């Protein structure tokens, strides 16, 4: 199997532990190294490669290819998305299944009042052991369909520590369907959650099970 945008090995860990024939591609060399350290007790942990998912070439085909946790949404324009999907197709055979996991855009999320910050998570800092709170603000461009997000990190006394900025392309189901069909994929299933319930108007997720 092949995971694209494999990150720090969050999904790879259980797959490799259970003996899967796993390969991961990750753009960040730092994330790839963290994944290898996490998985170094397993013989196939070195199959995590640094590469660009828009232009990779592995000279083999896989039974299963997947991209999880909204990573597809970091492809911010049609050229990047088309290049990615073209690369995926070159690594598929007639029985390959390709899984894409993204969230369904929510207008309440996209069109927040400017400057509003919404709590998204809390975690314990590994060094200071203090609780760090993260709040999110965003600005959505309806023409480009790109959502620019800022995460604001606060300590437990509400002092701002730092911010992180990132952008995500928003795909509504109709646009996603058209993109996949135009790129030559068969949509076998569209699920709205991890329990494989059919995608509907209230689904928070879009999970696509695809073939050639």
Where are these regions (language model features)?
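A short His-aromatic
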Residues: 73-75
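Conserved class I S-adenosyl-L-methionine
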Residues: 1-5
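Class I SAM-dependent methyltransferase SAM/SAH-binding core
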Residues: 10-55
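A short acidic, Gly/Pro-enriched loop at the edge of an enzyme's catalytic core
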Residues: 57-64
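SAM-dependent methyltransferase
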Residues: 99-177
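A short glycine-rich, Lys/Arg-flanked "PGG" loop and its adjoining helix->strand segment in the class I
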Residues: 82-94
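A conserved beta-strand element that flanks and buttresses the S-adenosyl-L-methionine
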Residues: 66-68
């Amino acid at each position: 199997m092949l995971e694209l945008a494999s990150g720090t090995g969050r999904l790879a860990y259980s797959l490799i532990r259970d003996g899967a024939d796993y390969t991961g591609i990750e753009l960040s060399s730092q994330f790839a190294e963290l994944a290898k350290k996490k998985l170094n007790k397993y013989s196939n942990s070195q199959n995590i490669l640094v590469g660009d998912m828009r232009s990779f070439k592995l000279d083999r085909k896989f039974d299963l290819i997947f991209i999880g946790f909204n990573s597809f949404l970091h492809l911010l324009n049609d050229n990047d998305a088309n290049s990615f999907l073209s690369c995926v197709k070159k690594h598929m055979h007639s029985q390959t299944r390709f899984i894409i996991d993204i969230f369904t855009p929510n207008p309440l999320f996209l069109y927040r009042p400017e400057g509003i910050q919404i709590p998204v998570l809390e975690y314990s800092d590994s060094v200071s052991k203090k609780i760090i709170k993260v709040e999110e603000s965003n600005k959505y461009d309806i023409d480009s369909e790109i959502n620019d997000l800022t995460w604001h990190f606060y300590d437990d006394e509400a002092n701002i520590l730092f911010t992180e900025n990132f952008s995500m392309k928003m795909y509504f189901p109709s646009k996603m369907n058209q993109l996949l069909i135009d790129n030559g994929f068969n949509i076998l299933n569209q699920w709205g959650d991890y329990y494989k319930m059919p995608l509907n108007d209230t689904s928070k997720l879009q999970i696509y099970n695809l073939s050639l």
